[in-house]
């Protein structure tokens, strides 16, 4: 989808901006290049990996994005070897993923809240998002998305 092209352009620009503090790989199975996808669905997760995961890093950051088929679904993984998410913030993000309200005290960005809501509207209840993070080791988001029931474009 156009989403992966935008992400590749975004990563190219950010890599230049941060003077090669990180590298990236995108592994997209060709048959899933046309999978219907919400606009800017992955960007907030990729941006957070760069801004927070690689903050202060001069070399050695690695961001991997993979999309492949899994039955009637597409599985998208965003994985970094950054600093990881502090436990309290991770718990708050887990609650957002479950659709629960969380306090703004932790300043969880609107980007993740917005994307999670749009994914569930567009793909339905069978869409799954999971998060794994360990401080000092990195963060991984996984999306398991069915072919959308809705035919109109996701906003």
Language-model-derived ranges and their functions:
Residues 139-147:
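Short C-terminal beta-strand
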């Amino acid at each position: 989808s156009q989403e992966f092209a935008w992400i590749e352009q975004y990563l190219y620009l950010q890599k230049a901006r941060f003077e090669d503090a990180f590298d990236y790989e995108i592994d997209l199975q060709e048959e899933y290049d046309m999978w219907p996808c919400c606009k800017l669905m992955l960007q907030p997760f990729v941006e957070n990996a760069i801004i927070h995961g690689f903050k202060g890093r001069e070399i050695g950051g690695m961001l991997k994005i993979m999309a492949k088929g899994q039955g009637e679904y597409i599985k998208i993984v965003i994985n970094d070897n950054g600093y990881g998410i502090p436990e309290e913030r991770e718990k708050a993000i887990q609650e957002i993923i479950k659709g629960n309200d969380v306090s703004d005290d932790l300043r969880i960005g609107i980007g993740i809240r917005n994307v999670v809501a749009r994914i569930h509207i567009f793909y339905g209840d069978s869409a799954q998002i999971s998060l794994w993070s360990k401080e000092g080791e990195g963060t991984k988001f996984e999306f398991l998305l069915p072919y959308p029931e809705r035919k109109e474009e996701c906003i």
